[in-house]
C-alpha cells in the first residue's frame, strides 16, 4: 500500500511555509483545497504544485456534505476542479460521485479520477451497492471512507473490499473505516486489497488516522522476514 498524507493550508502564507522535507516518507500528497476560501484556491495552487513538483499529488475539494470544509454548488465544484486540473495536471482528481452525480459526465475527460464516497455518520447497509456502482464506472481509483461504530462495521467493509478486489483485480480500491475501532482497516490495507492508506502529519484529516511516522514503523514490522 502507498501512504497518503494531506496538506491543508488555510492561506497562501501557510502554503508557502510548508516544509516539504517532513513529507518525504509519504508516497502521495493530497492537497485538501477545501480549507481555503473559494476565491483563494487558484491563488494558492501555484505554491502547492511548486512545493511538491515531481511528487504524486491528489487534488481534493472535500465539501461539507462529505465531511469537508467548503460549501459549493455543483457548478462551482466542477468549475474549480476543471480550472486547477487544466492548469496543473494533478496525478489524481478526487470527485465526490454521489454528491455531484449529475455532473459526472462533465468529468469524463479526466482519466485520473478518484471517485469517492464519504460518510462521517455510519457504515451504511448498502455498502455493496455503493461499491458496485463506483466500480462499474472504472475510474482510476474507487475510494470509500465510512464511519465505523463497532467491530462488525469494520469487518464488513474489509470483507467487501477483499471481494471486490478479487473480482476486479485491475481496479484500484481505497477503503477506510473511520474512527478508533476502524484503525485496523488502515493498517491492513494490503490484506484487504486497498491500494492506499491515509496517514497524518501534524493534523489528521479524518477520525482514526495514524501518524505517518507510526505508519512507517508498522509497515517495517509487517514487512520483516
UniProtKB/Swiss-Prot annotation:
Amino-acid positions noted as binding 3-dehydroquinate in the UniProt annotation, renumbered to this chain: 6, 30-32, 62, 186, 205, 209
Any one Pfam family match given in the protein's UniProt record, by short name: DHquinase_I
GO biological process, one term: 3,4-dihydroxybenzoate biosynthetic process
EC number assigned by the record: 4.2.1.10
This protein's UniProt keywords: Amino-acid biosynthesis, Aromatic amino acid biosynthesis, Lyase, Schiff base
Alphabetical list of InterPro entries matching this protein: Aldolase_TIM, DHquinase_I, Type-I_3-dehydroquinase
Oligomeric form and interacting partners: Homodimer.
Record PANTHER family: 3-DEHYDROQUINATE DEHYDRATASE
Recorded family membership: Belongs to the type-I 3-dehydroquinase family.
Protein name according to UniProt: 3-dehydroquinate dehydratase
Organism: Streptococcus sanguinis (strain SK36)
